[in-house]
Amino acid sequence: MIDEMAEKPGAIAKMVAWQKEHISDRQMTLILAFVIGLLASVAGFFLHSIVHEIQILLTSGFEKSTYNLLFLLFPIVGIYLTSLFIKYVVRDNISHGITRVLYAISTKQSKLKGHNCWSSVVASGITIGFGGSVGAEAPIVLTGSAIGSNLGQIFRMDKKTMILLVGCGASAAIAGIFKAPIAGLVFTLEVLMVDLSMASLLPILISCVTATCFSYILMGEKSLFDFTLTDPWELDRVPACILLGVFCGFVSLYFMRAMSACEGFFAQLKQYPYVKLLFGGIILSSLIFLFPSLYGEGYSAVNILLKGRTEADWDMVMSNSLFYGHSQLLVLYIGLVTFTKVFATSATNGSGGCGGTFAPSLFIGGFAGFFFARIWNIYKLGVYIPEQNFTLMGMAGVMTGVMHAPLTGIFLIAELTGGYLLFIPLMIVCISSLLTISIFESHSIYALRLAREGKLLTHHIDKAALTLMGMQSVVEKDYHPVSPDLPMGKLVSEISRSNNNFLPVVNQAGVLLGIIDITRIRHIIFRSELYKRFKVKQLMLQPSAVLSDHEPMQEVMKKFDETDAAQLPVVDVNGVLKGYISRTRLYSTYRQIVADMSAE
């Protein structure tokens, strides 16, 4: 769509032409960084407004002291409306927002579709507003990244700048939605794997600061989480902080494994959309009815734990539930909510809703931290630890474990709450959590799927270069296939027209049967008495290796190293020949990408 716009004569094409003539790409990148920050903050404000207004409309009349049967209805309605919107308006898959951004960077030259600039905002707004137990952050990250990608496509930026603009959009989304510019910056570094050099640092900072400033203008100065530090950190709480980090690591592992299992279950129902909607909707509605804290993002419930000072304050987290008024069940309620949140999130997305796992990880972390502190204090396992502080540190710990992003966890929580006085315990918890989860999972919840497919862009420059190459950039099509029944005399004629040292042998369906290695038959090709005696099928060899057209480039490079071949054929899933890759072109393309990535 963007390419077509740029090709058509008109205002946009003229603007791009004027820019190329009068403004350097470096200057234009800085301008676009500002625009991306502005638009990302507006998108975040719009999404939160949708969610807030829908929730006020639906739940403002609920009595806190009694349960409400409408909790059984609202989530199903929201998921159904979202499914209709995606099916008939968007007509594309917009789930897994951050994973989709990572996929675009590694395999699609950072190109995201135009509808991603708005579709996730609307879909997730409906889902969360009606009670879907997911987060708004991943849809906003996808939206911000799509804004950066589409602006980059309009102004025809190069591949490296496209990655940078996508990173600007993602960082602006996080910075704007949380009013946390440093967290937005390190999120791009840790989660999206965008390398920061002096050339890329400035545009991302511009986007983060711009998004933060406009978020203050649009949404006021109030922080997303209301926290006041009344009990400063003390050195004798270090053992508790370490144990909390380990606990958060195991909670993160449970979250990731349970999410993966639930996604697999709902994927099996893909052919039965209404069954999937009904089944997931019933699970979600039932959980929200039992535990209303699971309604929507759940940040209001986390704020109750952060602001509370007494049992009476914390009991408010059980409002609208069957547990309300039974303060002795508070710890049980907190534990059950922590355990069931992952199923509520999975049911929301699996049944057709739209949302991310960013907010659920913060929610689970907050509840897990409070649960840990209450158990510790009730059974007097050591020195007293303040529940509010450990709720905050639990949020950082679980987010670190789920995203493998300790700096994001530390700076986000510190910026959100102004809790810089808790910097050291935050670091202890995040490090302990990351060390624990890393024993079992080497990738974040966003990168896990791509890592298994060999499509994950990392900070390792060699692996990143291979990921960015892509199979299509090195496959050559200038081959001359021959039939297995072709006489040797005609084969010699084909050899004279070929510029390669091998000819692929294919059947009538185009399926690869073998190859003719010219270097192996050079000693007989001039013996005319053999021309009618031999056919291609008697002379062909099996290639030392065959490449799949969807094979990760790391595996392609490995096969060339193992076989020492000059060329290797490429086939599709049915064995049909699609071309070949030459060692010369492979290494030439690789060296060029490494040089581009290393250049400032």
Question: Residue locations for each model-derived region?
Answer:
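Alpha-helical transmembrane segments and immediately membrane-proximal extracytoplasmic
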Residues: M1-L468, Q472-D478, V482-L513, Q567, ...
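ATP/adenylate-binding site constellation spanning eukaryotic-like Ser/Thr protein kinases
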Residues: S207, V429, E476, I518, ...
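Post-kinase regulatory C-tail/linker adjacent to protein kinase catalytic domains
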Residues: E453, V536, M597-E600
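The conserved cystathionine-beta-synthase
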Residues: V482-N499, V506, I525-S528, V546-V573, ...
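Structural signal for short hydrophobic segments within the conserved structured cores
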Residues: D478-V482, Q538, P543-V546
